[in-house]
Amino acid sequence: MSRSLKKGPFVADHLLKKIEKLNAKGKKVVIKTWSRSSMIVPPMIGHTIGVYNGREHIPVFVSDQMVGHRLGEFSPTRTYRGHAKKDKKAKR
């Protein structure tokens, strides 16, 4: 179920404050965050946000096409290494 429009998008307060400070100064630095559920809003465009995936912070450069998506969508938590190869020698 999606979030009600009258509530507006969820963005962590600490993350939004950091973005607004950087926009006022005009600086571009990587902002580390653990808030994967925060929605990408227009003030974030052009910033690089380090999104935690459970092991490390993955840098995500925010573009205008990402607005409305969540930060966690761009930081995969699972590593897929492929299925096991067929071992013909083991079958003999």
Swiss-Prot record:
Keywords: Chloroplast, Plastid, Ribonucleoprotein, Ribosomal protein, RNA-binding, rRNA-binding. Protein S19 forms a complex with S13 that binds strongly to the 16S ribosomal RNA. Pfam families: Ribosomal_S19. It comes from the Eukaryota. It comes from Chlamydomonas reinhardtii (Chlamydomonas smithii). Belongs to the universal ribosomal protein uS19 family. Residues 73-92 are annotated as: Disordered. Its main location: plastid. It is found in: Plastid, Chloroplast. InterPro entries: Ribosomal_uS19, Ribosomal_uS19_bac-type, Ribosomal_uS19_CS, Ribosomal_uS19_SF. Residues 80-92 have a biased composition (Basic residues). GO terms for cellular component: chloroplast; mitochondrial small ribosomal subunit. One of its GO terms (molecular function) is rRNA binding. This is Small ribosomal subunit protein uS19c. One of its GO terms (biological process) is translation. Transmembrane segments: none annotated. The lineage of its organism: Eukaryota, Viridiplantae, Chlorophyta, core chlorophytes, Chlorophyceae.
